[in-house]
């Protein structure tokens, strides 16, 4: 290796190695490529005292340590730690300019999230800051957050725009996300969310802003190939169901599948709009009744719940238990953002799901892995420890049982993170 560039290229090559002495390996013999739903969400097969072979950055094979083959291939000793799939966080806003702890204090003093937004805080506050932040500054701060969530165990993440709310600022955000895609081994999907809030210059003219998104922003985003999805915040005080459907329809014409922020604050019609236009997922879902469950049961749309938003804003939690028992597929995500969920730690999301939404630990892990992968369209290559999927997994400390992960909500149980066959 004659030069630094040669050394760097060598280190970036996906490796071939064994993980040995695994206390418990959560492996997917079936090769799941569809979300688990209903009763199947509690099924999480494993083998004990195992080895796992990673070959050229992908999962190759596994078996019992009692049958470990003689080999010259290098091995990493898990020392009885468990191996589980890396988290798949399908809903984040981790590209942003500045934190909003002043609004945190305002809520302590009695203001609601909606009242803060009406006073120019919330999403508008973030948008005004972002417009005055350079692309490089945005990239540098977002890269720090990306490295942080990788160390928490996240191996695939969806990142939304939506703090620009004008053409140049939305493009700036999406270009940052594009740069992040090649910065680490974490798999990233980008989501165009100009319909996050109506900016001040369009106050009282939501229809005009929607037309601006459709006619001016969307063609440019597609021309530059900056987005994998299109999104709308369909809720009370934000975008109407009618305008949500207009944006989803326009996105479909450009080949962008929809995702929706729906029913966080009220029964908004967002779920029905998502089902009507074949959205990949509808997210939040704090306000869900029989009509929404029925609509989702007759669709291919995944329900993504975001319990840390309910925790941080003191909102009701999504009725996850009711939704799973009805037969729906659920995914869990962080909603990592500066205003309503300033954390990207997926293990805490599992704890909230179990404590506040009565999800079983096995259901929570599936919701945060294979179902999360499905909710951002990466399930063919990520989300489970299956042959020929990319080797994204975690090695934990030795555990007594799976329930200890959500139970010990303040502990960092992850010893090693492996993404695409590379130790992080």
Describe the function of each predicted region:
Residues 18, 24, 73-77, 190, ...:
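Conserved beta-strand scaffold positions in the cores of enzyme catalytic domains, especially
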Residues 4-70:
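N-terminal metal-binding scaffold of metallo-dependent hydrolase/deaminase domains
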Residues 22, 52, 57, 80, ...:
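Divalent metal-coordination and catalytic microenvironments
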Residues 85, 147, 245, 249, ...:
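Alpha-helical segments flanking ligand/cofactor-binding loops in enzyme cores
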Residues 78-141:
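Metal-associated gating/positioning segment near the N- to mid-region
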Residues 257, 267-382, 396-400, 409, ...:
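Active-site-adjacent C-terminal substructures of enzyme catalytic domains
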Residues 126-141, 147, 155-268:
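Metal-coordinating catalytic core of metallo-dependent amide/deamination hydrolases
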Residues 36-41, 368-370, 390-424:
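C-terminal cap of metal-dependent C-N hydrolases
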């Amino acid at each position: 290796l004659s030069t630094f560039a040669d050394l760097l290229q060598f280190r970036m090559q996906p490796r071939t190695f064994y993980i040995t002495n695994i206390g418990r390996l959560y492996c997917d013999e079936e090769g799941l490529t569809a979300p688990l739903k209903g009763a199947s969400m509690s099924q999480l097969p494993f083998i004990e005292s195992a080895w796992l072979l990673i070959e050229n950055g992908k999962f190759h094979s596994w078996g019992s340590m009692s049958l470990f083959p003689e080999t010259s291939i290098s091995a990493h000793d898990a020392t009885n730690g468990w191996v589980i799939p890396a988290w798949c966080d399908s809903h984040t806003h981790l590209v942003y300019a500045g934190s909003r702890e002043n609004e945190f204090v305002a809520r302590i003093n009695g203001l609601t999230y909606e009242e803060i937004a009406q006073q120019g805080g919330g999403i508008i506050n973030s948008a005004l800051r972002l417009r005055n932040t350079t692309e490089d500054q945005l990239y540098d701060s977002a890269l720090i957050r990306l490295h942080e969530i990788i160390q928490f165990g996240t191996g695939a993440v969806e990142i939304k725009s939506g703090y620009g709310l004008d053409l140049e600022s939305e493009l700036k955000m999406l270009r940052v996300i594009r740069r992040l895609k090649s910065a680490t081994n974490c798999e990233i999907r980008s989501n165009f969310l100009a319909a996050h809030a109506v900016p001040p210059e369009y106050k009282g003219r939501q229809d005009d802003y929607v037309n601006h998104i459709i006619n001016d922003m969307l063609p440019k985003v597609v021309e530059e190939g900056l987005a994998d999805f299109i999104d709308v915040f369909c809720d009370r005080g934000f975008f109407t169901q009618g305008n949500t459907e207009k944006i989803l329809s326009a996105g479909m014409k450009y080949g962008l599948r929809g995702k929706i922020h729906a029913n966080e604050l009220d029964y908004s019609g967002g779920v029905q709009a998502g089902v009507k236009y074949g959205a990949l997922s509808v997210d939040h879902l704090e306000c869900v009744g029989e009509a929404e469950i029925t609509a989702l049961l007759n669709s291919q749309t995944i329900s993504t719940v975001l319990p840390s938003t309910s925790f941080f804003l003191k909102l009701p939690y999504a009725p996850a238990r009711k939704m799973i028992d009805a037969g729906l597929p659920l995914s869990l995500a962080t909603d990592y953002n500066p205003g309503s969920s300033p954390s990207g730690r997926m293990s805490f999301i599992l704890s909230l799901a179990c404590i506040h939404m009565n999800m079983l630990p096995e259901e929570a892990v599936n919701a945060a892995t294979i179902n999360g992968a499905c909710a951002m369209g990466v399930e063919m290559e990520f989300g489970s420890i299956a042959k020929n999927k990319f080797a994204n997994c975690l090695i934990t400390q030795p555990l007594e049982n799976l329930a200890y992960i959500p139970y010990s909500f303040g502990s960092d149980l992850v010893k090693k993170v492996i993404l695409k066959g590379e130790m992080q």
